[in-house]
From Swiss-Prot:
One of its GO terms (biological process) is protein folding. The keyword Chaperone applies. InterPro entries: UreE, UreE_C_dom, UreE_N, UreE_N_sf. HAMAP family: UreE (MF_00822). It comes from Burkholderia pseudomallei (strain K96243). The keyword Cytoplasm applies. This is Urease accessory protein UreE. Keywords: Chaperone, Cytoplasm, Nickel, Nickel insertion. Belongs to the UreE family. Residues 171-192 have a biased composition (Basic and acidic residues).
Amino acid sequence: MRTIDKRIAPNVRLAATLVARAPALTLAYDARCKSRLAATLDTGEDVALVLPRGTVLRDGDVLVADDGALVRVAAAHEAVLLVRAPDALTLTRAAYHLGNRHTPVEVGAGCLKLEYDPVLADMLTRLGATVERASAPFQPEAGAYGGGHRHGHDATFAEDYALAQQVFDEHHGHSHSHDHDHDHDHDHDHQHGPCCSHGHHHGHR
């Protein structure tokens, strides 16, 4: 089994034809955050990924195997939420609440993308955002990290945490009465970009 142990720095220019010929390693976001991983190239070859601790791979990265061969990284399609809003203030509030939980977010033009999470989908809907489930590559802003930590020093912590706790309790069977319909109709035109994918599943359950 070959070992992939190096990543070529983004500022190193490689011939496009050389990269295009390299086999792809298609990984979801969680897998791209792991520095030690048993993986399978798109060719079917099993490989071992052994990179420096803390390495987060991005779509388009080029790796080097122990035999000198190149491997290109591709972001896999995965379940995500596309978050839009009727105005900039609502979208900003949605981004704030996600950031307060250290939720990895990909920022697009008038849209936020995050990993699928029914609890967060419910919270964002209550904030006034439109939430759409889709299957698409996910590449959050560099430096983002997960965890959902609580920040007691934040001025809006009590209100923010109370809302999140209410949603959490309802999704775990305590009280599941909602005053809104989870299904959303989307009449907007699709534009290609970070927040566009085809074959969407509208609404969330």
